[in-house]
Amino acid sequence: MPPPPRTALLAASSRCLKCYEIGLKYASRNFSALNRPLPNYPGHVPLNRIERGVLAIGSAFGSLINPYRHDLIAALGEATATPYFIYRLRDAMLSNPTGRRILRDRPRITSETLKLPYLRNLPENSVGWTYAKWLDKEGVTPDSRDSVQYIDDEECAYVMQRYRECHDFYHAVTGLPTMVEGELALKAFEFLNTVLPMTGLSLAAVVRLKPAERERFFKLHLPWAVRSGLSSEELINVYWEEQLERNVDDLRTELGIETPPDLREIRRMMRQQEKRAKEQQAQGSSS
């Protein structure tokens, strides 16, 4: 793959600036619930600027209170992605041969399209086997992703949907679990890789971590996220459906992603240390 096209995270192409102006014009239209424009695609909900702002603020506070409200996180992602950031991500796909193919083919990631029983029977350490194993271990399914509603441009709505559906592949290739600590590490990586504001805003949930977890995040996983996020290829351009039989280690190397510290193993070792410390304390007090 060629080097990442982003030399600066917020550098914009002329196409992106033009799309920004178009999106800003659309967002500033004076409409209300009585004269709302027709939807641009099935499920689309047009919003004016005030409604988009209210949605962003409300979903941000709601997702901070409950990080497992995926519907609020999805709404936050859409409300803050326009009028600039989702166009930047779309332009990154247009500037990449594989990204252009994805935009042309419009593949969807579901348990049916991926044929999960087939993935479970692939060789160990293949991308597909790793993905299916991660889904089973975490108890999640690719069918649970919310549909995009609040992105006005139909093509950009697909880009957001594609990012959303690929999220579990990012989990699988990094090995990060769905617990809050793992999600924060992945969101930090995604922010530097995609520049979507929601991924950066999600890091506010670090205040919900326990002191030991917060210290571990800043010492181990945040430095990993910065290194890998800045040096890796743009993951939106990965045609995951064509990588399923590849060795996951080879793909990680090709994409420029370091393997992060094993969060589950770290937490297991910490629990064992705490258990031994309590046992020693109990023995000392009884002697």
Swiss-Prot record:
Enzyme class comes to lyase
Q: What is its EC number?
A: 4.1.1.130
Q: State the membrane topology.
A: Peripheral membrane protein
Q: Name one GO biological process term.
A: ubiquinone biosynthetic process
Keywords noted in UniProt: Lyase, Membrane, Metal-binding, Mitochondrion, Mitochondrion inner membrane, Ubiquinone biosynthesis, Zinc
Q: Where does Zn(2+) bind?
A: H167, D168, H171, E183
Q: Which cofactor does it need?
A: Zn(2+)
As for family, the record states:
Belongs to the COQ4 family.
User: Entry's HAMAP family?
Assistant: Coq4 (MF_03111)
What is the name of the protein in this document? Ubiquinone biosynthesis protein coq4, mitochondrial
Q: What organism is this sequence from? A: Talaromyces marneffei (strain ATCC 18224 / CBS 334.59 / QM 7333)
